[in-house]
Amino acid sequence: MKRINITCPACGSRAYLRPASVVYGDKAPDPDAKYYVCGRSPACDCYVAAHRKTMLPMGTLADKTLRKKRHDAHVALDSLWKNGIMSRKEAYRLLQLSMGLPAEDAHIAKFSAARCDEVIALSRRFRAAAARAA
């Protein structure tokens, strides 16, 4: 595995690949998972999950506030396909096209808080339109 350098966007420190226990302690939802954690942790609370196969980061490091915003954006977008409004693939394609993003950048784990707000608003509009059409 090639070593990669990841810098924390909040404090500028280097991030390191660590086991899930560093982030979650004994309560890790997936003890085998890996995370990129800011080298200033716990003073700086930024981290992001790593892809299981490649060990590349799934997105950008995020603090607690941004992680919550990303979670909320996922819940909003996922509601479109979980409620049968469209398929999962269609929901993510909608996200990509509506935001003018290339496929490789259409991942909520890469989004800022403002982009997450766009996802939430977009999802609301589509849920409302589907309800009116029903």
Task: List the model feature ranges, each with a label.
Residues 1-7, 31-34:
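Short metal-coordination and nucleic-acid-contact micro-motifs, chiefly zinc-binding Cys/His arrays
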Residues 109-123:
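Short, Lys/Arg-enriched alpha-helical microdomains
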Residues 54-89:
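Extended interfacial segments that mediate partner engagement and assembly in macromolecular machines
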Residues 17-22, 48-55:
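Short Cys/His-rich "knuckle" micro-motifs
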Residues 7-12, 36-40:
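Cys/His/Pro-rich metal-binding microdomains
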Residues 121, 125-134:
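Long C-terminal interaction/binding lobes of large macromolecular proteins
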Residues 27-51:
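Cysteine-rich micro-motifs
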Residues 13-29:
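Short recognition patches in nucleic-acid-associated and regulatory proteins
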